[in-house]
Amino acid sequence: MKRFMQIWKPAVVGFLLLTLVCGVVYPGIVTIIAGAAFQDKANGSIIERKLANGETGKYGSNEIGQTFTKPEYLIGRAASDGAATNLNPTSEEQKQLVEKRIAWWHKLDPTNNRVIPMDLVTASASGVDPDISEAAAAYQVDRISRERGISTKTVKEIIAEHTSNRLLGFWGEPTVNVLQVNLALDSLKM
């Protein structure tokens, strides 16, 4: 029995110590630092708004795309159901998926004859991208204006208000947050 304890005691103590350090202490420290340094992002970047009854309602996250399909809304990138897309860009399956999405856009807005921006017919790498390009937002302005009975100028102003610039002024492209635009559109008095 003594030999058994000599062998297993260090293993059990090591297991418990590593579990405590790696499972409690380290995540706790990282959570505290993240909460202090990035207060809004550490808790999911949840968007909250005051409701008519005075309570606060949660509408979603600034960092996770939501599906909008009604014509009066700005519609984001094609969702891939929360999973990354692994399709080869030149595969037949990808081609059929893009053609299906193009047909959906033409059915949604048959009067729009412009070329559909690529990000509206392809899914992002994460499958839950909350932003679209300025071109993708501009493609939808006339439809949103018509469906909501508001001027295109108003729609463009709302889109511009929720467009983020390039990172550090030169990295990447400006993007438009779909959820923020739709919340702003819904807040308009009609």
UniProtKB/Swiss-Prot annotation:
Q: Cellular component GO terms, alphabetically? A: plasma membrane
Q: Name one GO molecular function term.
A: P-type potassium transmembrane transporter activity
Q: Kindly provide the name given to this protein in its UniProt entry.
A: Potassium-transporting ATPase KdpC subunit
**Membrane topology field:** Single-pass membrane protein
Location(s), subcellular: Cell membrane
Organism from which the protein derives: Listeria welshimeri serovar 6b (strain ATCC 35897 / DSM 20650 / CCUG 15529 / CIP 8149 / NCTC 11857 / SLCC 5334 / V8)
Role played: Part of the high-affinity ATP-driven potassium transport (or Kdp) system, which catalyzes the hydrolysis of ATP coupled with the electrogenic transport of potassium into the cytoplasm. This subunit acts as a catalytic chaperone that increases the ATP-binding affinity of the ATP-hydrolyzing subunit KdpB by the formation of a transient KdpB/KdpC/ATP ternary complex.
Q: In which family does this protein belong, per the annotation?
A: Belongs to the KdpC family.
Q: Which residues cross the membrane?
A: 13-33
Specify the superkingdom: Bacteria
Determine if ATP-binding is one of this entry's keywords: yes
Under the heading Pfam families, the entry gives:
KdpC
Q: Does the keyword ATP-binding apply?
A: yes
